[in-house]
Amino acid sequence: MKVCATIPIKERSTRVPRKNFKELLGKSLYKHIIDNCLAADCFNTIYVDTDSEEIKNYCVSKDVEVIDRKPELSLDTANGNDVLHYDIENIPNYDFYFQLYATAPFLKPKTIRACVDKLLTTSKYDSIFTATEEYGWYWYSSQPINYQPNILPRSQDVAPLIKETTGLYGISKQAYHRYRCRIGARPYYFILNDPKESIDLDTLRDFSRANEYTS
């Protein structure tokens, strides 16, 4: 079975200017996920979808393939599914596609490898994503989500909510073509027990949190 990684990294960012180029642990943010995917040693090919010449040059130096990002995918209106659609159109000959993000620099190579192994060896699931379990009393749109206020469970019995970390997604080619989405109908959520691995760097506050972990 052929497995590839696709890493979307655009040059421009809105909330944190040049976010993907900010330095973290002595190197630009975008380099961490590329290097971690290489270290995982579980992909037939690693692709970086980018519009940045600097990132393209780094990919060449690491023998990583480049997908030239089309301009509309660099707009704030584009999302991860849009990028995955475009990438699969350009590289259609894989059995499994994994999408990883530069904003998850602490995702360990062994975790990446474990996610790939899980999806490839378990037919029960058609997709996978990294996640955390969130415990507490949650509400949405004035309604309780995971408990009934008039029947209070013990805190240790409360059902957790599953939160995507948005660091890694994987899906079979068959499921992708059926659902046109990076998550299929039978996903496995891979729980990250190390809080550091679940960090998603999207705001200046996130970077401050990351610095706390690395100081």
Where are these regions (language model features)?
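Short beta-strand scaffold positions
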Residues: D49-T50, G170, L201
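Short phosphate-binding loop-to-helix
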Residues: E53-F98, L107-A114
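Short, high-confidence coil segments that cap the C-terminus of an alpha-helix
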Residues: F43, N93-Y94, K124-Y125
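N-terminal glycine-rich phosphate-binding loop and ensuing alpha1 helix
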Residues: K2-D49
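Conserved core of the sugar-phosphate nucleotidyltransferase
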Residues: D82-V83, P105-K196
